[in-house]
Amino acid sequence: MSALPAMPRQSLQRFPSLVHQRSVPAQPQELPQKTHYRIHLIRDRSVRDHNQQKNIKELSKEETAIYRNSLKKNICIEMLRKGYHKSFSEVFTVIQRWNALRDAAGPGSAIWHQKPLEEQQEILDQLQHFLTRAEAAQRAGYYEDVYKNQLALAQYFQELDDRWLSYHFFECCFQTATKIKSDGGRKEAEAHENLGLAEEEHGQLEKSAEHYEAFYHLTVGRIWKDETGRSHNSLACENLWRIYTLQSDKMLENRECQQAIKTLIKAFDMAREGDNKKLEGEAAYRLGLAHISSGNPQMAITYLNTYMEISKMLEDNVSLGKAYKAMAKALESQGKILESVEYLENFIKIAKLNNLSRSLIETYSCLGDIFNTRGNYEKACQYFSEAYETALSLSDLALIEETQVQYSISKAHKMMLTVSRLTDTADYASIGHLLAWKMNRSDIFSDPAKPELTSMKDTEDGGKSNVIMESSDDPENETSAELVATS
């Protein structure tokens, strides 16, 4: 590898201008100016550093700890510094119990995916605010204020749909309400109602009923009213009606009819005492159905008559239709078919006037069932056909399929009358008719005006007459009679 030739060093003598500049002495008048300029720069920097030091704020140990500690720790320390030891214990206990509840639920549960309570600043702020105020009021002996602050927390968590925390503070409200003697027990009554609602949401019907009954007894003879102007006693009656109704539903599911009837009677009495006609009618309707299930149609008719009267008074056509249907069922169980059909046909008129299409379908189907069970397949086909046509107008596929099956079964039953008659006759003509039908699989028995095939039909005077029928190859004429055909 060859090296590059060395660069010749050039002397400064070849650049006289540079040499001349280096040999020129500095001007005397410029020295003070440069020195003064340098001093000026140093002086400015010292002033700037001094101002920066003045603007820097030193943090105290407490302020530094705020940034270092967790949110929960800061709130707890603040409450302890201000002397709210009970509030500190309450917050700490609530967080511990919430975490234990979360761990018990395990991964995959709804609470497991929630943000930990100690990391939710808004909730901790609300706890600190209302608990400290409640503690201060308790020290002063103002239990009404303690109750208000605890109730505010319970309602706050209720809005967040946190049932556990809302129930916890509703319990605290109840404990505080028992210490308030100046209001005649009003706060205690309200606390019972709140606990009853909370227990009902948890599905604890027995405990809920106990609180509602206590609420009712505390409000008897009182003129207390809530924010909407409703009396507490009417609210207690409504709550008891609802909880008794829920209890009776479970009893009926377990086929405890007599116990359910006793519970429904209590619901009926509560609705009547609360002067709520709609609830009274609903309780009477349920009592009627329960008596039908227990095999006592006469008592059912008594309550159903009450339901009909209330429905007419309230001009509630939907409820009136329910009453007619239930009454028809009770009369049918007594063997009074004509009266049963009359009630159902009355409801059909009401349903048509009020465009109650779904109720109309149910009634048509009910009438179809009655006639189908009694062997009047002609009438059954007529009503099931009406149900099917009405279902088509609603474009409800599930309902269409259900009514279609009912209509098909009734037509098959109707057709089987002729099939059975021809089979029993067993003569040459009858066998020929049956064979022709098996070859064509058309609805040859439904229309007596068709030629080619004849069958024997009963006349009104008990004799026999030949009915001519025709088979058809058109697939559109095929009906559900194929459901009962055998190959």
UniProtKB/Swiss-Prot annotation:
The keyword Cytoplasm applies. PANTHER family: TETRATRICOPEPTIDE REPEAT PROTEIN 29 (PTHR46630:SF1). TPR repeats lie at residues 92-131, 136-173, 189-222, 241-274, 281-314, 321-354, 361-394. This is Tetratricopeptide repeat protein 29. Keywords: Cell projection, Cilium, Cytoplasm, Cytoskeleton, Flagellum, Repeat, TPR repeat. InterPro entries: Bac_ResReg_Asp_Phosphatase (IPR051476), TPR-like_helical_dom_sf (IPR011990), TPR_rpt (IPR019734). It is found in: Cytoplasm, Cytoskeleton, Flagellum axoneme. Axonemal protein which is implicated in axonemal and/or peri-axonemal structure assembly and regulates flagellum assembly and beating and therefore sperm motility. It comes from Xenopus laevis. PROSITE patterns: TPR, TPR_REGION. It comes from the Eukaryota. Residues 447-487 are annotated as: Disordered. GO terms for cellular component: cytoplasm; cytoskeleton; sperm flagellum.
